[in-house]
């Protein structure tokens, strides 16, 4: 009997300790960080409407806060503006002259590739820049990229104008050099002809034989001319 009691006692103690061990394991697992499970990324639940399928004929009529604060709308507007002819862009831009940032930005997008002058482009950028504080934060990065593109266009126009002036100056200098070259060429030809004439004269002089002291035209002393019959001969004494 005692032997049986000794065998059952440790088993009862072991069974009684199982709940404690289970609780201890739960506490340890609770405090242990979950290394194996990947951390879930917190993505804001916010979806933007995609205007890629919107017809270009309808894109300009869309308005409202949800549309005007959507950068995808402005990207689609830029894409549609690139497909217009310059005259069409100017005609469309005349409809947005109320002075709001939305319509001013639309004007800028439409006129950017309408073959405007650098002065018109500079004035256009200045008007939009004056309203830049009203542009929503969602659209501001896109607007800044557009503004940087316009600044590059103005810089390119200045470089072209500077190159044109240099080319005109170079052309004028080239014309002057051509005229000087023509004058020098004429002088060189005249000098060459003079040298050729002098060379011919020297050649002619060198081919002549040198003459002696006797001249056939001069009569010899012994050959005096006979007195003329008309000469009067004095009488001898």
Swiss-Prot record:
Signal peptide, first to last residue: 1-25
Q: Where is the lipid attached (S-diacylglycerol cysteine)?
A: 26
Tell me the segments the record calls region Disordered. 201-237
Keywords from the named record: Cell outer membrane, Lipoprotein, Membrane, Palmitate, Signal
Q: Which GO terms describe its cellular component?
A: cell outer membrane
Q: What happens when the gene is disrupted?
A: Mutants are unable to form pedestals.
Please name the InterPro entries in this protein's record: QseG (IPR025262)
Q: Write out the N-palmitoyl cysteine lipidation residues.
A: 26
Pfam families, from UniProt? Answer: Lipoprotein_20
Intracellular or extracellular location(s): Cell outer membrane
Membrane topology note: Lipid-anchor
Main localization of the protein described in the UniProt heading: membrane
Function description:
Involved in the regulation of virulence and metabolism in EHEC. Required for pedestal formation in host epithelial cells during infection. Necessary for translocation of effector molecules into host epithelial cells, but is not involved in structural assembly of the type III secretion system (T3SS).
By what name is this protein known?
Quorum-sensing regulator protein G
The protein's organism comes out as: Escherichia coli O157:H7
């Amino acid at each position: 009997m005692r032997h049986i009691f000794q065998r059952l006692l440790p088993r009862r103690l072991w069974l009684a300790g199982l709940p404690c061990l289970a609780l201890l394991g739960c506490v340890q697992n609770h405090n242990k960080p979950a290394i194996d499970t990947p951390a879930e990324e917190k993505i804001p639940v916010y979806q933007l409407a995609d205007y890629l399928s919107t017809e270009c004929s309808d894109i300009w009529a869309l308005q409202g806060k949800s549309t005007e604060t959507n950068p995808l709308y402005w990207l689609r507007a830029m894409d549609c503006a690139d497909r217009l002819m310059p005259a069409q862009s100017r005609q469309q831009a005349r409809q947005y002259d109320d002075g709001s940032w939305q319509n001013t930005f639309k004007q800028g997008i439409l006129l950017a590739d309408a073959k405007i002058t650098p002065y018109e482009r500079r004035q256009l950028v200045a008007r939009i820049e004056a309203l830049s504080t009203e542009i929503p934060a969602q659209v501001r990065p896109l607007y800044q990229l557009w503004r940087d593109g316009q600044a590059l266009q103005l810089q390119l126009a200045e470089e072209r104008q500077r190159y044109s002036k240099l080319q005109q100056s170079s052309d004028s200098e080239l014309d002057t050099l051509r005229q000087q070259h023509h004058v020098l060429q004429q002088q060189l030809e005249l000098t060459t002809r003079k040298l050729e004439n002098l060379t011919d004269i020297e050649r002619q002089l060198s081919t002549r034989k040198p003459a002696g002291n006797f001249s056939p035209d001069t009569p010899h002393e012994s050959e005096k001319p006979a007195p003329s019959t008309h000469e009067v001969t004095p009488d001898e004494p």
